[in-house]
Amino acid sequence: MAVCIIDHDNIRGVIYFEPVHGKDKVLGSVIGLKSGTYSLIIHRYGDISRGCDSIGSPEIFIGNIFVNRYGVAYVYLDTDVNISTIIGKALSISKNDQRLACGVIGISYINEKIIHFLTINENGV
């Protein structure tokens, strides 16, 4: 299992890469983006010393996520990515080829857990 913590400006989230019922899944949630569709992309390097400018070229398109009107995206995507090959690389959240936030993909301790998703009510709270 792998995990990526996103914490860039006001954009925050946790993205997990893990096998679920024999299929690799991308799970998590992201907050702080404007409503719309964004891309999750794996990049060549896990170097975030200069933010998203130092993560290298895009390598793997994971899929699109939709951010609701409250600025929340719930992530649940299928992927064919071999999880062991992405450890140490970066994951970016992008729109129109602009990298808005990124984080390094690391190894996550394998244990039984429940993933809690952030929920926002109709009042944005």
Curated annotation (Swiss-Prot):
GO terms for cellular component: host cell cytoplasm; virion component. Disulfide bonds join 52-102. Its main location: virion. Keywords: Disulfide bond, Host cytoplasm, Virion. Gene3D superfamilies: Superoxide dismutase, copper/zinc binding domain. InterPro entries: SOD-like_Cu/Zn_dom_sf. GO terms for biological process: superoxide metabolic process. GO terms for molecular function: metal ion binding. It is found in: Virion; Host cytoplasm. Belongs to the Cu-Zn superoxide dismutase family. Superoxide dismutase-like protein with no enzymatic activity. This is Cu-Zn superoxide dismutase-like protein OPG175. The gene is OPG175.
